[in-house]
Amino acid sequence: MDRRTFLTYNAAAVAVPLSGMGLSALTDAASAAVRPAPIDFKSNLPAQGSFPKKWICGSPSSMDNTDPPVQVHWYNPHTAILRQNKAYSYEAPFAPLYFGNDRVLLLDEGFVQLRNDWDLRGIVDQCIDEWCRRNGRDPASLELLVAFSHLHADHYAAVNQFADRPNTRYMGLTHEEMVGFWGMTHFPEERVTLDLGGRDIVIWGSPGHVVSEFAYYDSHTQILYTGDMFYRGRCYISFWQPWFDSMKRLIDFCDTHPVTHVMGCHVEISVDGEDYPYGLTYQPDEAPVEMTVQQLREAFAYAQKITEPGIYFTGTVFLCNQTRSLTTIDKNPYRYD
């Protein structure tokens, strides 16, 4: 099956469905008699939701940690946000789970630095079962799309758990496979729209932290998910000009679309602006994962003033032009202004 059948259209072009939609429509019509009425994901926007006041954040002793391997928080009835336990991975990535009438999208699948005895697939299946019970659906009728924001192992290490799961498609581990999964032909500028079944996710490229990275905008909650390109932690800028270009694309998008929250994939900062050391497995006073468009703008403006290697706090994130193994300041296009 053409992977692009779950895309509605290229957002920069005329709204013409891609190949495979006709077959999908026939299948939907045949099963309409037994399916409940579709959920309306496009009225009364943005769909209201909330983040928890405190996420699971590790413990002084990982050996004595009693929290579940993954915390599941329902932002609203059709959106779950998962977070990996820091006792299993000090990266503790977040993983949005978006539900539509036909498909479910899982973004970022966690890491296995400290322990690998965690069943992400089982937890995702539990979430799908719960959503289907609430909405009168058959879990087998929903296709699961397993994707990630970028090519770092803390975002895809658990993808293999889904390899033999029925009715599932997952993103490959090369740049070409990532871009091809979304049917893109002009990365990173091109926007494509993923149709989950009445719920649209807008996707485009956001390189800079790494070459292969995407931004995801959920039209239902109006949350902009930025992965590691912009998050409450150490934003390692490996490629300065692509990063500035990506930040400009994010801001341009926010200028023309309503955005309730900007959300990254990690939290590595305390509420007081403390930079938690790399590899720490206990962060008792974490800052919230959600950010604002204004904080995105402030970080973009701040980055243009950086002229020396170091780590710079914008008030929201740490901009790192000297990573753990690579200094990249000489690539900052603003260095000699």
Q: What are the language-model segments listed below?
A:
Residues 5-30:
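N-terminal export signals
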Residues 102, 140-143, 167-168, 257-259, ...:
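A general structural motif
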Residues 68-134, 216-229:
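Conserved beta-strand hairpin/beta-sheet module of binuclear metal-dependent hydrolase folds
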Residues 112-196:
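Active-site HxH/HxHxD metal-binding segment of metal-dependent hydrolases
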Residues 34-59, 248, 252-337:
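Accessory terminal helices/loops
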Residues 76-81, 191, 200-202:
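Short, hydrophobic/aromatic-rich segments at coil-to-beta transitions
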Residues 104, 111-113, 200, 205-207, ...:
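Metallo-beta-lactamase
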Residues 80, 145-147, 171, 204, ...:
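Hydrophobic/aromatic beta-strand patches that form the interior of the parallel beta-sheet core
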